[in-house]
Regions:
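C-terminal active-site subregion of NodB/CE4 polysaccharide deacetylases
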Residues: 2-177
Length: 178
């Protein structure tokens, strides 16, 4: 999100032209570089793609088709046990987070998550480049309010929420703090 919107759109158009010229296809899926997205960039992506993937872990869900979570499988996270474990994770039927823009110009310590169900058995974890961030959890009807103990540092801020109930449910979200 550090490029201008015009630069991002031009890069997408150029990339699509190169792919079309060399492979004869037009991609309809997008992966945000390093998972770094913003609401403004998502608006551009919606013009050219059917769905987009972030770089945050979580169960596959179409709750937000332009910021889909995924589990990376690579040399660091590619053991057979991890693949088996990741493939059985379930998504929450409904999930939303506030603030809802993955690009955060001003860091903040307060987050509201809504799963549209009783959240008493849901736990959320926050982490940035300095490690885990502890906080206070307050339950309000179907919502969880988290007040973090410290301000997140610039870079990536990850949110992971889980619930164990006839399977493991997982919600993930990634912010990029400028």
């Amino acid at each position: 999100p550090l490029q201008t919107l015009v630069e991002i759109e031009n890069e997408i158009l150029l990339s699509q032209k190169i792919i079309m010229d060399n492979l004869g296809i037009k991609p309809d899926l997008f992966a945000y570089p390093y998972g770094e997205a913003s609401s403004a960039v998502q608006g551009i992506i919606k013009k050219y793609f059917k769905a987009a993937f972030g770089q945050h872990s979580g169960a596959f869900s179409f709750n937000d088709p332009y910021y889909i979570a995924r589990f990376p499988i690579n040399e660091n996270y590619g053991s057979l046990e991890r693949i088996k474990s990741s493939s059985t994770v379930l998504s929450f039927k409904h999930s939303s987070i506030m603030p809802n823009d993955p690009f955060m110009k001003i860091p903040q310590k307060r987050f509201v998550l809504d799963f549209q169900e009783n959240p008493s058995s849901i736990n959320c974890y926050f982490s940035d480049f300095q490690g885990s961030i502890l906080g206070t959890k307050t339950t309000m009807n179907t919502k969880l309010l988290y007040e973090l103990d410290r301000m997140p540092v610039p870079g990536r801020l990850r949110v992971n929420c889980t619930k164990i109930d006839q399977g493991t449910f997982w919600y993930g979200y990634q912010y990029y703090l400028n």
